[in-house]
């Protein structure tokens, strides 16, 4: 179905309860409902937003268009968690219900401040001429989960500096001062990151500090979803540079999600990441974008990603549902690399550990499991996951120890990552996989492997010892 602009931007109150019930019934028919990933009840899920800790709970939002598998009039759906594994909806939704966000509640972030959770997000306004004006808007949630929007924008666009591509504010605290990064396209059509600070930490009064200096390379034509976090005294910038030259970072997806590690973050005469290293892919898989990371009150760093990509269709679209979020990953730095690994509480989903010899025979699974292989004393092999009795696989993983590579094969598409492979953990959740090499040195993710009803086994070209756990939430 091709959606017109009018259909995409129908107001929420124009849909009846009967319309919503029909959408829910259709979505339930999808054969690929996940077991331990966050996905929408109906419609499209994309960017994770507002990832934070407040009032003794983890908070998370996701961008949502409830009425179809397309990018339409967006809102935010609110979730809370005690353990970063089990998330529950609170019923709170940040709706596009003011003149400043009448064309959608776009991405943003959150920060616990005093007795409330402060939200900052991009509100898209469109007038009768359909010209877009992006405003950075604010809201706050109290300890009773009551939400109030600020009546006026916090940051207005300056079209002498940027185009209307000016979005995705990330608020963070550094050395007692509150700052905000905003992804943008400069008036010269280059990707930039704008930096602001809250004057005297007044969250309604922001000063433009200029652009963040972190690379001599041209950052494509637009930067989305910038995040700055701090790990063991180092500064880590995570962002999505659209149109990035592939000579800077090799990537095969429509848009990359990358990171850079620096020694320090400074403001004043220069707003910069000092001694910033090279850009590195955050994920070497097929579909990972719009990662949001933040520092918890104890300083630890976490991230969660949208397993999907803009301007992409999926088999679930016919059920009027699309998009999932990754597992929450804890972040660390080792040997000047960013490591990402599922939070420790994920282990509590494991059911009955099995030690198996996997060979060219089918071991039946539920397509909801964790598979672990210690490759230090084992041979190279080709793993077939989500396979049937004939050996037809939805996903293959080729481990080449001699050349230190791992290759993903999905429907004749391939992704290649270079790494000395000692250990591999594979998480499968129906149509989703997340693979972690060496406890997070490399990550390869995807939400577009759609096995048929007969593809639920695993096999290996060469015999290897594995550990296998079914995962139940």
Curated annotation (Swiss-Prot):
<feature type="binding site">
    <location>
        <begin position="106"/>
        <end position="107"/>
    </location>
    <ligand>
        <name>substrate</name>
    </ligand>
</feature>
<dbReference type="InterPro" id="IPR013320">
    <property type="entry name" value="ConA-like_dom_sf"/>
</dbReference>
<protein>
    <recommendedName>
        <fullName>Sucrose-6-phosphate hydrolase</fullName>
        <ecNumber>3.2.1.26</ecNumber>
    </recommendedName>
</protein>
<comment type="similarity">
    <text>Belongs to the glycosyl hydrolase 32 family.</text>
</comment>
<feature type="binding site">
    <location>
        <begin position="44"/>
        <end position="47"/>
    </location>
    <ligand>
        <name>substrate</name>
    </ligand>
</feature>
<keyword id="KW-0378">Hydrolase</keyword>
<dbReference type="InterPro" id="IPR001362">
    <property type="entry name" value="Glyco_hydro_32"/>
</dbReference>
<keyword id="KW-0326">Glycosidase</keyword>
<keyword id="KW-0963">Cytoplasm</keyword>
<dbReference type="GO" id="GO:0004564">
    <property type="term" value="F:beta-fructofuranosidase activity"/>
</dbReference>
<dbReference type="GO" id="GO:0005985">
    <property type="term" value="P:sucrose metabolic process"/>
</dbReference>
<keyword id="KW-0119">Carbohydrate metabolism</keyword>
<feature type="binding site">
    <location>
        <position position="63"/>
    </location>
    <ligand>
        <name>substrate</name>
    </ligand>
</feature>
<feature type="binding site">
    <location>
        <position position="224"/>
    </location>
    <ligand>
        <name>substrate</name>
    </ligand>
</feature>
<dbReference type="InterPro" id="IPR051214">
    <property type="entry name" value="GH32_Enzymes"/>
</dbReference>
<dbReference type="GO" id="GO:0005737">
    <property type="term" value="C:cytoplasm"/>
</dbReference>
<feature type="binding site">
    <location>
        <begin position="167"/>
        <end position="168"/>
    </location>
    <ligand>
        <name>substrate</name>
    </ligand>
</feature>
<feature type="active site">
    <location>
        <position position="47"/>
    </location>
</feature>
<dbReference type="InterPro" id="IPR013189">
    <property type="entry name" value="Glyco_hydro_32_C"/>
</dbReference>
<dbReference type="Pfam" id="PF08244">
    <property type="entry name" value="Glyco_hydro_32C"/>
</dbReference>
<dbReference type="InterPro" id="IPR006232">
    <property type="entry name" value="Suc6P_hydrolase"/>
</dbReference>
<dbReference type="InterPro" id="IPR018053">
    <property type="entry name" value="Glyco_hydro_32_AS"/>
</dbReference>
<dbReference type="Pfam" id="PF00251">
    <property type="entry name" value="Glyco_hydro_32N"/>
</dbReference>
<dbReference type="InterPro" id="IPR023296">
    <property type="entry name" value="Glyco_hydro_beta-prop_sf"/>
</dbReference>
<dbReference type="InterPro" id="IPR013148">
    <property type="entry name" value="Glyco_hydro_32_N"/>
</dbReference>
<comment type="pathway">
    <text>Glycan biosynthesis; sucrose metabolism.</text>
</comment>
